[in-house]
Each structure stands twice: as structure tokens, then as C-alpha cells.
Amino acid sequence: MSLFICFCCQEPGASDEYNIINYGIGGQIEVHVDYWSPENKRSGGARVAPFLGYLTSLQHGGMTVFPGLGLAVSPEAGSALFWLTVNTAEDYDSRMYHMGCPVGRGNKWVLSKWIYSDSQMWSFPCARREGNYPSFTNQS
């Protein structure tokens, strides 16, 4: 089985600018989900896919943890996480709650970007038509 995902990120409003974030010793982020409900979404639509790139490696702490998936990822320079926060109906996936554990030693530097739904029309042309909600991924 192969997995292919393609998102449009170049047109205005398709995604946020890249953010570089630093967490020093003890730095962390509490459990949250990268999602805005349709009632509160910004222009550009719902956040559908966060990208988190690790710019530094850590020996102690700083893991990104998804409690609902039983998944913990240690920061390793040059690696990245990418996940979907919603289905094509823009309903959030509760398994995508995550947190950044406290940094034990050193500095955790990450690069983040959020991709929004409204600019994905050509990636998923039937996603919002008459309740037709296919998967965001094409599997073969």
C-alpha cells in the first residue's frame, strides 16, 4: 500500500508563514489540537494539516506526544512530523491532541507551518460537495 498526500501551500491564505519556535530548558506546550471549528475559523478555512520540523536533536525531553495514539516522537534534527487534524467535512480528529514535553537539556528549535482547507479545492475537488466526504489520502 502506498500513501500520497498533496497540498497547495503557495497561494495567499493557503497556509501560515513558517514559524521558528524555541523551547529552552523546561520549555513545553500543553495538550492541544491544531484545529479551529467552522464557527471560529480564519479566512482560508480550517487548519487541516500541521507541519512540524525539528531543527535540533535532544538527548533529554522535548518529545512530541499524541496521547490518543500512544505515540511519542523524540526531536531529531532534520526530521519532521506531518498530520491531518480533520476529515474533509472539517470535523476534528480527537486523536490528534498532542503536547510538547518539557525540554530536559539544551534547546528545542522547531519549524512549524499550518495548512488551511479552502485552498485545497484542486487537491480534493469533491470534498465539500453534497456531503461527499472522501478521505484526504489516496491509498493504493
Question: Where do the PLM segments sit?
Answer:
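Fe(II)/2-oxoglutarate oxygenase catalytic core
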Residues: M1-F82, V86-S140
